[in-house]
Each structure stands twice: as structure tokens, then as C-alpha cells.
A protein has these predicted regions:
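N-terminal Rossmann-like dinucleotide-binding module
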Residues: 2-29
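NAD(P)-binding Rossmann-fold cofactor-contacting core
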Residues: 27-51
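Short acidic low-complexity segments
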Residues: 62-75
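Hydrophobic or amphipathic alpha-helical targeting/insertion segments
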Residues: 75-83
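Rossmann-fold NAD(P)-binding glycine/threonine-rich loop
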Residues: 89-159
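Internal, well-ordered domain-core segments that constitute the primary functional module
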Residues: 130-214
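Long, compositionally biased stretches enriched for glycine and/or charged residues
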Residues: 183-454
Length: 454
């Protein structure tokens, strides 16, 4: 029986995965779950759906709601954060502005990082405020961070506060798509995935206890071209086809380990992304998740999902367990809580400070690695050395971009934002970078950021 707070619970589809997992985890029944969101409408929706789901599954949980973050944190033992400050529309406008300045599909992770907003300012500020509130109201609680940018955010929190912080993502499950494409039975597949959030690589791949990288090599040599002409690849959703795309295979050839999940798009070389036709060659007919085609498909998918949630919310007779079958969702948040609260040892894929797990990465940089979770806490598993080329051309540059973002944020340094953008191969002059930074910071939703970055 524990106190769990979900900050940003109005993200209904995501929050329902937490509720679903809580309702089927009987060892956590009796827990208090506080749903917090600044939107009363969304809060009412998730509360309604939660109560109905509990009734259908006969789960025993105490549910409270609030629009006040500090009330939600009072005496919490586990805090789940899913907040995206300001929503997604400002980011779409920022992308359009960047394109006018010569940056096709926006400036990516070189300044704003993965869905962080420009300079990640609003997200990082919120993360730090949340952690400071936790130091006052629930200093012994665990913060389970899901909101992006996870890499920058968890590194910042772990350095600047005393809060126990875990970053969680589901991108590493991309290995399942790989195994399925290779025709392997998942129950006989064992992988180790390591790196940074959205930049993870398959360091070990076993099938029935034997090294399975040769099976991947064989597929690439004999079957990849046929697969890329198949209906499964050509007509699949962009976020489902990336894992076994030409981009993924080429990254493996370039850097020595196979990229997993979001890595295929967010850590891939710039020359895969110069224009739509180039993206199509590497990612398939849509150009991948981040192209104008792929992103439009995703936004329509999100909209249809929200409409579906609203329809179920408006229909008291609709079955929640039909929409969300009462089995574990696959997300790791509730298993983390169950492991720590009830001392059930599990190995999970988490973002935690390195502490010598990956060689060549400082101890205070958060890495995404397998970790042992139990009542004793969280202990990362030693990964060791990554290929030198991967370290030099991907890992260290990505780590330095994280450091640039955090330095600019902590010091309010506008010039650092410009200098970070100067490293983008699309930047032709200092004036181009400076004018883009100035225009982005001039947007009304960035007024506070403009004052911060002097």
C-alpha cells in the first residue's frame, strides 16, 4: 500500500496504461493514487475512466484528484511525471519558423532536443521546480520521469537535487520488432540494450543462448532487400517500420551495433534527413516518423485516439476492459513501483546515473541501461565498452549536446544556444543561427525563456 501521484494525468491514453497496470497488480491494491493535471476537463475524464475501470476489474485503489501540484506531492512515495508544458502546437510553429531559416523539419535535438521545446527551457524549468517541491514535501519519494527530454531532464535533476530519479521510456522494446522480422520466437530472445535515452544500441543479442548477431547479418545479406519491397514495410505505420529500415541497417554498418527503437531516427546521421526524398530512401515511403508525411500521420493518430477516449468517456455503457484489456500494458512504471515497494527483484531498462556502467561516460551522466530493481533500490548493470567509432561519432557528441543544453539553461546563456546551432551542418553563417534563435525566443510562449536566455 503506497501513495502514488501522477503529474500530468490529463494525458489520458498514457495515464490509462498506469491505471490498467495498477488494477491488475494486486500487490499494490489499497494504494492511494492522486491524479493531478491543470486541465479540469482532462482531469474529470481520466478520473471517470479510472473509476469505471476499477469497477470493471474489481480493483481496490483510493483515487483522488487535484489541480494543485503541491497537494499531489504531499506525502507521495512515487511520483510519475508525464507533463509536456504548453502542449505540442508551439513546437509545430517553431518547426515552421526554423524551416523558413533553412532548417528542414526544424532544428531537431541540436538545440531543442527530443520534444523538449526550444532549448528545452520550459520542460527543464518544470522538472527542476517539481523536484524542488518534492524535496520539501516528499523528500524520500521516487520520481519516475517519462516526459521528454528524459536524457537532459534526469541528468539535471540528479545533479541539482537530492531526489531519487528514474527515467523511463519504451523505445528499447524495438528489439521485439527486430526479432519478429527475423522470424525468432520472443521467448528465446535475450538482448542487452544500452546508451542514452533515444540513443540506445543492442550490445548483446542471444537466441536460445547463442550469439544471434550472425542471424541478423544473414537477414541483412539475404532478406533485407525483399523485406523493403514488402507490403509490411511499404504500408506500415512510420513508427513501426523504422526498426528494420535501410537507415537502421546502415547505422549498424557505420557504428558496429544495431540501433534500437527511437535511436533509428533521433540518433541517425544528418545525411539521412536532408530532404523528403532522401528520408524516403532511408526510412520508406513516408520518410519516417519525423518527416512531414510521417508526423502528419502521427498527429492524426493522436487526434483519433483522443476522440476515441472522449467517446468512451461520454458513453457510460462503454466497456473499459474491452478498450484496455486487464493485462499488463508493457510500460515499466508500475513494475518499478511494485519492485521497490514490495521487494520484488526485477531487471528493467532504466535511465539512471552511469556510475561506471558504460566505459568512457562520466558517472553523473544519466545512461539508459538494464538495472536491478528491488526493495533495496536501483542498481545499474555493468555494460562495459562500446565500439570506439560509436563512442566518438555518436555517444560523445550526443552527450556534449546534452551538456550544451544544460549549460545554456543553468546560465541563461543565449550565445550558447547560437553556438550549439552552429554545429548543425545546415547552418551557413552565424547570422543565420542568431536570427533563428532570436525569432524563436520572440514567440509569445517563449517570453519567459527570452528573459532567461540573455
Amino acid at each position: 500500500m503506497v501513495n502514488i501521484s501522477i503529474i500530468g494525468a490529463g494525458s489520458v491514453a498514457f495515464s490509462m496504461s498506469f491505471i490498467r497496470d495498477l488494477c491488475v497488480t494486486e500487490s499494490l491494491w489499497g494504494s492511494k493514487v492522486t491524479l493531478m493535471d491543470i486541465s479540469k476537463d482532462r482531469l474529470n475524464m481520466i478520473h471517470n475512466l479510472t473509476v469505471r475501470y476499477m469497477k470493471e476489474t474489481k480493483a481496490n485503489l483510493k483515487i483522488e484528484t487535484t489541480t494543485n501540484r503541491k497537494d499531489a506531492l504531499d506525502d507521495a512515495e512515487f511520483v510519475l511525471c508525464t507533463v509536456k508544458v504548453g502542449g505540442y502546437q508551439p513546437m509545430e510553429t517553431e518547426r515552421e519558423i526554423a524551416e523558413r531559416h533553412g532548417y528542414y523539419r526544424g532544428i531537431g535535438d541540436r538545440v531543442c532536443d527530443y520534444y523538449g521545446g526550444f532549448g528545452a527551457y520550459h520542460q527543464l524549468k518544470f522538472f527542476l521546480e517539481l523536484a524542488r517541491d518534492m524535496e520539501d514535501l516528499c523528500p524520500d519519494a521516487w520520481l519516475i520521469e517519462t516526459a521528454n527530454p528524459v536524457f537532459e531532464g534526469t541528468t539535471l535533476i540528479s545533479r541539482e537535487t537530492k531526489i531519487k530519479t528514474i527515467g523511463v521510456c519504451h523505445g528499447h522494446f524495438g528489439y521485439k520488432k527486430m526479432a519478429k522480422t527475423l522470424g525468432l520466437s520472443l521467448k528465446d530472445v535475450n538482448v542487452e540494450v544500452a546508451g542514452f535515452n533515444h540513443c540506445v544500441w543492442m550490445t548483446h543479442f542471444l537466441y536460445k543462448g547463442r550469439d544471434a548477431y550472425p542471424l541478423l547479418d544473414e537477414w541483412i545479406e539475404e532478406k533485407a532487400e525483399k523485406y523493403w519491397k514488402s507490403e509490411e514495410f511499404l504500408k506500415g505505420l512510420p513508427w513501426e517500420t523504422e526498426q528494420m529500415s535501410p537507415a537502421a541497417v546502415d547505422m549498424y554498418k557505420q557504428f558496429g551495433l544495431f540501433p534500437i527503437g527511437d535511436t533509428v531516427r533521433s540518433a541517425s546521421p544528418w545525411w539521412y534527413h536532408t530532404d523528403l526524398e532522401t528520408k524516403k530512401r532511408w526510412f520508406g515511403p513516408t520518410g519516417g516518423f519525423d518527416s512531414e508525411i510521417g508526423w502528419s500521420i502521427y498527429l492524426k493518430y493522436r487526434e483519433s485516439r483522443l476522440k476515441r477516449m472522449q467517446s468512451i468517456y461520454s458513453d457510460p455503457s462503454a466497456s473499459l476492459t474491452k478498450e484496455f484489456p486487464p493485462v499488463m500494458s508493457g510500460e515499466q512504471h508500475i513494475p518499478i513501483i511494485d519492485s521497490i515497494a514490495n521487494d520484488k527483484e526485477k531487471i528493467l531498462q532504466l535511465n539512471i546515473p552511469n556510475k561506471n556502467s558504460i566505459s568512457g561516460i562520466p558517472d553523473d551522466v544519466v545512461v539508459e541501461i538494464p538495472a536491478v530493481v528491488s526493495g533495496r533500490g536501483v542498481q545499474g548493470i555493468h555494460v562495459g565498452t562500446l565500439p570506439k567509432r560509436l563512442m566518438l561519432y555518436v555517444m560523445i557528441p550526443r552527450m556534449m549536446r546534452m551538456e550544451q543544453i544544460l549549460q545554456a539553461f543553468k546560465e541563461g546563456d543565449r550565445k550558447s544556444l547560437i553556438l550549439a546551432l552552429m554545429e548543425d551542418p545546415r547552418t551557413k553563417s552565424y547570422e543565420q543561427a542568431r536570427s533563428l534563435v532570436d525569432e524563436l525566443l520572440a514567440q509569445p510562449w517563449n517570453a519567459e525563456a527570452a528573459r532567461h536566455y540573455r
